[in-house]
Amino acid sequence: MTVYHFVGIKGTGMSALAQVLHDMNYTVQGSDVEKRFFTQKALEERGIPILPFNKENIKPGYTVIAGNAFPETHEEIQAAHELGVPVIRYHRFLGEFLQKFTSIAVTGSHGKTSTTGLLAHVMQGVHPTSYLIGDGTGKGIEGSKYFVFEACEYRRHFLSYFPDYAIMTNIDFDHPDYFANIDDVFSAFQEMALQVKKGIIACGDDEYLQKIQAKVPVLFYGFGDDNDFQARNVVKTTEGTAFDVFVRNTFFASFEIPHFGDHNVLNALAVIALCHYEEMDVRIIQERLKTFQGVKRRFSEKVLGNQILIDDYAHHPREIIATIDAARQKYPGREIVAIFQPHTYTRTQTFLREFAESLQQADQVYLCDIFGSAREHHGKLSIHDLQAQIPNSRLIQEDNTSILKQHENAVLIFMGAGDIQKFQEAYERTVHS
């Protein structure tokens, strides 16, 4: 049997896929940069070897799974070609692998990871379910009927997938380094919809998803009256959220989730709709929804003295608003402090005004330098351009996080898709020192 070698194994999708294959008794190893990433822990716990990049890592008989960030000129990929070792890109491999299961893709501009995690958690209460989540978490169960996975629209990678079902959470303009505009994003989702084989669960409150055409049934969920699955009588507390679900205007059941904000109600509705479609027991759905702990880097909380620290992946204006809203629901009356690290120059440039507006939902804003992606290390603008748009905002460096101590009893939200965790870790050290 072949050895699967992952080039860039610390990537979130790559790490999760490596875990899935390992759990299903395939032989797995991988290589990456030396820098430590939060995705490593699960790999290390499974004993999956993580090697430094070196062309000597590639041996005859291997199969190379290559991360999308690595060009054909990468030394390991070149070595594979020279040895006649097959090289398969991550999304292509996953697309072929899915065919062994009843597959459920979770896609959308926002909410993919949380919804994938929630769906996997609920379905595991009913059926053996393998899953791949974009927070670097994966689990493979031999003999599982279902495979739940996160499908990313970036560079249209999700067009490698032909799933049985798809959940579509929303369509929004993001990834401006690739997509030209919202119509370009919509066209990608429309193409994806035509590849789904059994059914689509889509948010009917989203104006773009309402226009989706498909060859299979489309069930809509949301708060609006026109949806097939509608949330009504929403009750928000500091413990979570409760709501009733009506299916085509007929009461179905009541549900509780230990999460906050309208976006989490919508995520739960999507899961309820899919499980209902697959005729799963409503009592199990209710119980599983109550016990979901969330996914990595999505409203991850920690108590530090009198302060609450929240780590969140929010890197788009709409996500920032959702995260701040959730914090206000759980911690009413507390000062909300946003510490934000913009992710990529192109996104910051494109949404400069929207970032300023969304961040001003917080009581105080601190800004970190822009985090450039692997594909872009500098841009025409700097963090000062965003600061100029936000009255009373301040810049923060990794070595001066102690200024956050002045916000006693506050909720500090560290947001971003780069390495914003470094700032939280630095702050925790100043408090403990």
Swiss-Prot record:
Top EC group? ligase
Classification via InterPro entries: Mur-like_cat_sf, Mur_ligase_C, Mur_ligase_C_dom_sf, Mur_ligase_cen, Mur_ligase_N, MurCDEF_pg_biosynth, UDP-N-AcMur_Ala_ligase_MurC
Chemical reaction(s) catalysed: UDP-N-acetyl-alpha-D-muramate + L-alanine + ATP = UDP-N-acetyl-alpha-D-muramoyl-L-alanine + ADP + phosphate + H(+)
Q: Name one GO molecular function term.
A: ATP binding
Annotated residues that bind ATP are located at G108, S109, H110, G111, K112, T113, S114
Location of the protein in the cell: Cytoplasm
User: Does this UniProt record's set of keywords contain Lyase?
Assistant: no
* Any GO CC annotation of this UniProt entry: cytoplasm
Q: Which is a GO BP term held by this UniProt record?
A: cell wall organization
The answer, when asked if Methyltransferase is one of the entry's keywords, is no
* Swiss-Prot/TrEMBL keywords: ATP-binding, Cell cycle, Cell division, Cell shape, Cell wall biogenesis/degradation, Cytoplasm, Ligase, Nucleotide-binding, Peptidoglycan synthesis
Q: Which range is the signal sequence, renumbered to this chain?
A: none
According to UniProt, this protein's pathway is: Cell wall biogenesis; peptidoglycan biosynthesis
Q: What is its EC number?
A: 6.3.2.8
Q: Which domain of life is it from?
A: Bacteria
Q: What does this protein do?
A: Cell wall formation.
Family of this protein: Belongs to the MurCDEF family.
State what protein this is by name: UDP-N-acetylmuramate--L-alanine ligase
Query: What lineage is on file?
Result: Bacteria, Bacillati, Bacillota, Bacilli, Bacillales
Which gene is annotated as encoding this protein in its UniProt record?
murC
